[in-house]
Swiss-Prot record:
Function noted in UniProt: May play a key role in the regulation of the intracellular concentration of adenosylhomocysteine.
Gene3D superfamilies (alphabetical): Adenosylhomocysteinase-like, NAD(P)-binding Rossmann-like Domain
Main subcellular location of this protein, as a coarse class: cytoplasm
Annotated positions binding NAD(+): 165-167, 199, 228-233, 251, 300, 321-323, 375
Protein name per the record: Adenosylhomocysteinase
Source organism of the structure: Pseudomonas putida (strain GB-1)
Amino acid sequence: MSAANMPAGFTDYKVADISLAAWGRRETIIAESEMPALMGLRRKYLTEQPLKGAKILGCIHMTIQTAVLIETLVALGAEVRWSSCNIFSTQDQAAASIAAAGIPVFAWKGETEEEYEWCLEQTILKDGQPWDANMILDDGGDLTELLHKKYPQVLDRVHGVTEETTTGVHRLLDMLAKGELKVPAINVNDSVTKSKNDNKYGCRHSLNDAIKRGTDHLLSGKQALVIGYGDVGKGSAQSLRQEGMIVKVTEVDPICAMQACMDGFELVSPFIDGINDGTEASIDKALLGKIDLIVTTTGNVNVCDANMLKALKKRAVVCNIGHFDNEIDTAFMRKNWAWEEVKPQVHKIHRTGAGSFDPQNDDYLILLAEGRLVNLGNATGHPSRIMDGSFANQVLAQIFLFEQKYADLSAEKKAERLTVEVLPKKLDEEVALEMVRGFGGVVTKLTKQQADYIGVTVEGPFKPHAYRY
């Protein structure tokens, strides 16, 4: 849809350039052909309209793939208001195409922190007043937190929140433990078809792409340090190994550390004997002095701290593929070192003091996306086929919670339902099956005898709840 086709008088949006809508529409049509699970759900539930009456507040990266998600939610009966969960991740043509379709959206690439907060507010507010929303779709937890702290009255009507990412799930679990969470949540992140596809295979595809776009560096033969070896770390390490890099991994979890060793990566620590006492003396300067690229993948804070940044090799590339920019101590860099913008989302950080700098100075770091998500700041993120699984899970999770009607329950029933849980395995398998069909694959069916032998039904689910894929 081009801007010319926008509903007359529609002004409930703010994007960078509405004239980009036709470009966004062309890309969205291509993305639809690469998202068989999501489009399969759209066709399957179109007549049933399971989200009719749903009013969804959405805050997730405003990309072309998200445009397909939004239009699927709308096709299944929902109304939505949308913003991006990251100041650099919006694809402006995608936001324009959604606005041109008459859907409220507030997102553009390169927002300031203040503009980001404003966009979150506009997601919640319609004509200056809180919209009568009844569902939340979040990525990272900023929207959920804002609703709890500033607009708690909105939550009285909300049936639940579906959370996309590790960081947001951690925040939800923390709120639940403290008795602060007011609505139930579905942990979309830990669905197998999200965590293994998006977190692992998506990062395998998009990390090296973003680094190369941002730096134009050849990566082969250089040394990389991947901080963290969860699903995101696993995909990131593979991504850099594919480029011919010499990849080292650092971990705090013995199980993930063992997996890194088994996968053939050298397990190291940036700290002498693995102990960070907060001083420069605890840093393994011999190790960090050889590192050409460091990437954080953890969702934790200051995993690349000031002392590590001081010890890194001259001209090393520093980036993050976790959710927030606090994995890298960018606050220290802003306070103590001079920043020189090379191009959007690429900075030389001169380690020669704050203020002025010599352009010929060679003691600098190259920081990508200001320490925020590198794959969406310096590139276009995961491909459509990867996001297909994640967003199909989001649709099923929205349907699941909307049908539960939490807001209409008695206080006693609400107390029982106030949880943070993953989708039922059967729905995870439904997404996986649609993805397999999209690849042209054929899944073998169990015979009744075989199903009985392993104690499952022919239709599934096929694995016990505790099974680790």
